[in-house]
Amino acid sequence: MLFPIVIGRIYNLEIIFVRHGESEANVLELMYGSSDYLLTSRGKSQAKKAGEILRGMNYEPIAIYVSSLTRTHETLTHMGYAVEEAKKDQRLDERHLGDLEGLDYRVLHKEQPHLFKEWNENWLEYKPGGGETHVAFQMRIRSFLKDLEKNHTKEDRVLVVCHGGTMKTIFAEIFQHHENYFFNLEVYNCSLMRFKQGQKGLVLDALYNIDDWCTGEEESWTSKS
């Protein structure tokens, strides 16, 4: 059983998961997962603010994990951490959407609604051409979580920078109610999820939406009072 969630009073191991900042593909509303896109200026500002939040918590990770994709590397850099010191793990990559990668979501939904109907009716096993099923995606995330549990002690602080779908799957895996939690959790750009080890398992300690901490234009965000 992975990471049972309980209410506990003694906290030791801490893990913070962060989604990458806004990417070019997010702005264009493209279907993408494994494709590599850069951060926008807004995404860089979001990452900078996420880093400030962690430093405000005096959060000093002894281990950092990051996916293999550029947008997470950029996010980590703008958060103030060295990518070279992070452990790059492809299991954290977003789901591979195969032939759907790079297509305009709005156009696709209008011109080929049957694709979304098929996807919704069999969402776990639906496989875009050349892509992967959600089950395959879920299994590699589960593998990462098992290794994370095995490789870290109760005294460790860990930072993981990854993707929206990855974080939703992690959340659902930890809570062991996959479908309900996957579809009912919104993970915005640079959202932070913090888990702490309680007496019997991991406790969801905090969930931050970075936009709630910022105001103003992309290049001049300030903390809200």
Residue spans of the language-model regions?
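Generic beta-sheet signal
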Residues: 15, 62, 156-162
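Loop-to-helix element that buttresses phosphate recognition and phosphoryl-transfer chemistry
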Residues: 15, 19-74, 128-142
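Phosphate-coordination/substrate-recognition cap region in phosphate-metabolizing enzymes
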Residues: 4, 51-115
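Acidic, low-complexity terminal tails and accessory targeting/binding regions
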Residues: 2-12, 89, 95-109, 150, ...
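Active-site signature of alpha/beta-hydrolase-fold catalytic machinery across serine-
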Residues: 78, 169, 173
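GST superfamily/GST-like fold recognition
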Residues: 164-169, 191
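Short, basic/glycine-rich phosphate-binding loops at helix/coil junctions
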Residues: 27-30, 115-126
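Histidine-centered catalytic micro-motifs
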Residues: 18-21, 161-166
